């Protein structure tokens, strides 16, 4: 009796968080960090530690835009959530 051959990496379940994160790379997102500050911008990179790289980034405290950056790097342990600002 032979065992089935490995099929490579397992595919994420449709609608899973890992699929969502893979689909938002290259899209405009909002990232909230632990201090309550939001960053919006184009998600260019995301890794397994939730480290985030944004381009055309803006920093928001509530409804007030406090800064604009060309590039912004957020350390994953500060990230509370990431939400898409455009349709996937």
Curated annotation (Swiss-Prot):
Example GO BP: maturation of SSU-rRNA
PROSITE patterns: SM
Keywords for this protein: Cytoplasm, mRNA processing, mRNA splicing, Nucleus, Ribonucleoprotein, RNA-binding, rRNA processing, Spliceosome, tRNA processing
SMART domains given in the database record: Sm (SM00651)
Pfam families: LSM (PF01423)
GO molecular function (one): RNA binding
Superkingdom of the organism of origin: Eukaryota
One Gene Ontology CC term in the entry: sno(s)RNA-containing ribonucleoprotein complex
Signal peptide annotation: none
InterPro entries to which the protein is assigned, alphabetical: Lsm6/sSmF, LSM_dom_sf, Sm, Sm_dom_euk/arc
Location in or out of the cell: Cytoplasm; Nucleus
Domain (Sm) ranges: 16-88
Gene3D superfamilies: 2.30.30.100
Reported function: Component of LSm protein complexes, which are involved in RNA processing and may function in a chaperone-like manner, facilitating the efficient association of RNA processing factors with their substrates. Component of the cytoplasmic LSM1-LSM7 complex, which is thought to be involved in mRNA degradation by activating the decapping step in the 5'-to-3' mRNA decay pathway. Component of the nuclear LSM2-LSM8 complex, which is involved in splicing of nuclear mRNAs.
Family: Belongs to the snRNP Sm proteins family. SmF/LSm6 subfamily.
Quaternary structure and partners: Component of the heptameric LSM1-LSM7 complex, which consists of LSM1, LSM2, LSM3, LSM4, LSM5, LSM6 and LSM7. Component of the heptameric LSM2-LSM8 complex, which consists of LSM2, LSM3, LSM4, LSM5, LSM6, LSM7 and LSM8. The LSm subunits form a seven-membered ring structure with a doughnut shape.
Protein name according to UniProt: U6 snRNA-associated Sm-like protein LSm6
Gene that encodes it: LSM6
């Amino acid at each position: 009796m032979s065992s089935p051959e490995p099929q490579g990496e397992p595919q994420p379940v449709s609608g899973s968080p890992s699929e969502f994160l893979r689909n938002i790379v290259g899209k405009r997102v909002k990232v909230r960090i632990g201090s309550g500050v939001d960053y919006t911008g184009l998600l260019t990179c995301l890794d397994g530690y939730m480290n985030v790289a944004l381009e055309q980034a803006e920093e928001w405290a509530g409804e007030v835009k406090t800064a604009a950056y060309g590039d912004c790097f957020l350390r994953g342990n500060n990230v509370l959530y990431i939400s898409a600002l455009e349709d996937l």
